[in-house]
Amino acid sequence: MPSTLLSLSIPALLIIYVFLYRRFKHRPPLPPGPKGLPIIGDVISAISPKTVGDMDQPDWARYLDLGKKYNSDLIHINVLGDHTIVLNSVKATDELLERRSALYSDRPRFAMVNDLIGWDWNFGTMPYSNEWRLHRRTFHQDFQPSAVLAYRPVVLRSTSVLLERLAATISDLSPTAHVEHNDLKYHVHNHAGSIILRIVYGMTTQEELDDYAKMAALAAESMNESLNHGTFFVDYFPILKYIPAWVPGATFKRKAKTWAPTVANLVNRPWEKVKRSFASGTAIPCIATKHLEKLSNGGDQPQSGDQDQHEDMEEVYRSTTGVAYFAASDTTVSLVMTAIFVLSHHPEIQAKAHKELDSVVGNSRLPDFSDRSDLPYLEAIFKEVQRMYPVSPVGNTHRATADDVYEGYFIPNGTSVIGNIWAVLHDPEAYRDPLKFNPDRFMVKDSEQPPSPELYAFGFGRRICPGKHLALETTWLAIACLLATCDISRPHGADSKKEIHPITDFTIGLTVHPQPFNVRIIPRTPTALKLMKNGYPSEDM
């Protein structure tokens, strides 16, 4: 019997060997990258990142350094058998994540984010599936460009409040004093939060705003620390999620235990509150009440193609409204704060914007959305802020669902694929002199303009952020109003030659913010101060 088994097994082993030999012999090479060590790969650099000053080097900078080292816009990293390919150019992201999006729209299963913290209700982390399609389609219906037009009165009202509160803060200061970072950020947080809470949940009180702002901030912390690929080893070894939190080295379990209740409350508490108001007939019309109305009428059930997913439409609505509040508030705050920080370093650019705004808008009213097409230099500033200092420097991780070949390099099925947004928006092939803040690059005729940063700053392909239209409208109006009414500058005594450092002057995470900074915000004229205090006419809101 043993000899019979041996005689049968030898041919089988030979067949397997020949199959594997032919497959790997003729397979193209993987993209260049750190060789690492046998079995564990590049785990050493993964757990011991370089430092810049007293900060860890962010992933986008490490990926960019690797691209320069290997002279390639595709980088392969192997950590414990987990293959990751990073895309560092416009060309590579356009080809793989846009044109071949059918192969690259999946997500890896992040044990930390989805299983331990509980972000699995967020369609941004869902795998490419019917469930994801249903959630995204539902979200898109509420935040597509045509839908966002209906929210403009809310945006105008909240922008009026932002200007009024800034005017009050400025009026209490001496002529040489500056606005403290925490005061400024509080006003900007209120601005962003009030818009999305009113649109999504019909909430308008300061108490509600403060409550949900704290909750969203802690939830954002969990996402920022956990979603970047490979932050926690449990993502490489999902079985680690079963070890008790008290085990030495299980810091990730203790962090997840802290974050999970907040993430659950983020999606459940506001929805349940609106449900109670809707049932009592006191709810303010909003996206949530629109969906509750559909549910009460028995409409908007899953289409036949989605029935196999057994989707409860209330859970879909609960989840998509939760995503809207969380994502929109953090992104908008980051973009507005970054714009203020950057403009404080560029008085010459502000002067050109002031001249354009005075010519188009005048000094008797605030700019509004109808002015946007007549303010090309302001638009150029807005684009250049997004390009130079992207809110999300590294895109969410995609996952290849089949073997692929690009530029002679092999990309295996199951590989994690990351678009390095910072590298893409500083690609010298697309943006001349990319390390210089220069709005004029977008002032040339359309045929000569570089790609709009909006194509890359909010993700790629079928996974691009569908809430970007509201975020961009909200941010544009805030920046337009600030430039129309104020001079923004660094505090007295600040080093006028100190330039913004893309690493040390920003936080690290999925969404980045400027490090704490103080700024002088001075009304340009007494008339401008009056405009800030009065805001938009009530008939516009």
Residue ranges of model-derived segments:
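Classical protein tyrosine phosphatase
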Residues: 30, 86-96, 103-105, 202-207, ...
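Conserved cytochrome P450 K-helix E-x-x-R motif and the immediately C-terminal K′/meander segment
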Residues: 46-71, 265, 365-408
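Conserved cytochrome P450 K-helix/beta-meander segment immediately N-terminal to the heme-binding cysteine loop
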Residues: 419-447, 536-537
